[in-house]
Amino acid sequence: MTRPEPNFKRHTARYRARRRAADILFEAESRDVDPVAIVEDRVELARDPENGVAPIADYTREIVSGAAEELDAIDDAIARYLSSEWSLERIPAVDRAIMRVSVWEILFNADVPNATALVEGVELASEYSNDKAAPYIHAVLDDVIQAQSADSPMAPASAEEPAEPAETAETEGDTK
C-alpha cells in the first residue's frame, strides 16, 4: 500500500520551519558538521536565486541554533524516556532529528505550547519515518512533557508530591 502524497500547502509556516530544522539536524549528524554552519551556508546560497536554495526561515534558524546549543540536555531528556531495549544511538537518525526539534520546543521555547510541539513532532514522524515511529515518538515526547510539567513551578501541588510519602502514609495508617 502506498502512502498518499502529503499536502504541504496545508501546513503552517512554523511546521515547515520545523521540518526544515529536522532536515538540517539530520544532515548535520549524517555529515558530522555543525548544524549552525549548514544554516549559514544555506542563507548564503539562498541569496542567489540561481542556486535554487530556498531561504531559511527565522524560526528554522532559532530551532537549529537552540538545538545545537542545548544538544546534551535534549539528548539526555530523550534518552531518559526511551524503552530499555533502545539507546539514543540506536534510534534512526531521522527520528532523533525530529525528537530533537520537538524536545527543544518543549524544554526551551515557552512560546510553543507543549501539545503543539508533540503533535507537530508526531506529524513529522508520520511524514518522514516508518509506521512504528510516530507512536513511539509520541510516547517519548509525552513523557518529556509530563516530566517537565511535574518539574514546573506552575504544576499543581499534587504533581510535585512524590509517590513514597503516599505509600508511607498508608503504611502508617495500617499500624495504628
UniProtKB/Swiss-Prot annotation:
<protein>
    <recommendedName>
        <fullName>Transcription antitermination protein NusB</fullName>
    </recommendedName>
</protein>
<keyword id="KW-0804">Transcription</keyword>
<dbReference type="GO" id="GO:0005829">
    <property type="term" value="C:cytosol"/>
</dbReference>
<feature type="region of interest" description="Disordered">
    <location>
        <begin position="148"/>
        <end position="176"/>
    </location>
</feature>
<dbReference type="GO" id="GO:0003723">
    <property type="term" value="F:RNA binding"/>
</dbReference>
<dbReference type="Pfam" id="PF01029">
    <property type="entry name" value="NusB"/>
</dbReference>
<keyword id="KW-0805">Transcription regulation</keyword>
<dbReference type="GO" id="GO:0006353">
    <property type="term" value="P:DNA-templated transcription termination"/>
</dbReference>
<comment type="function">
    <text>Involved in transcription antitermination. Required for transcription of ribosomal RNA (rRNA) genes. Binds specifically to the boxA antiterminator sequence of the ribosomal RNA (rrn) operons.</text>
</comment>
<dbReference type="InterPro" id="IPR035926">
    <property type="entry name" value="NusB-like_sf"/>
</dbReference>
<dbReference type="GO" id="GO:0031564">
    <property type="term" value="P:transcription antitermination"/>
</dbReference>
<keyword id="KW-0889">Transcription antitermination</keyword>
<dbReference type="InterPro" id="IPR006027">
    <property type="entry name" value="NusB_RsmB_TIM44"/>
</dbReference>
<feature type="compositionally biased region" description="Acidic residues">
    <location>
        <begin position="161"/>
        <end position="176"/>
    </location>
</feature>
<comment type="similarity">
    <text>Belongs to the NusB family.</text>
</comment>
<keyword id="KW-0694">RNA-binding</keyword>
<dbReference type="InterPro" id="IPR011605">
    <property type="entry name" value="NusB_fam"/>
</dbReference>
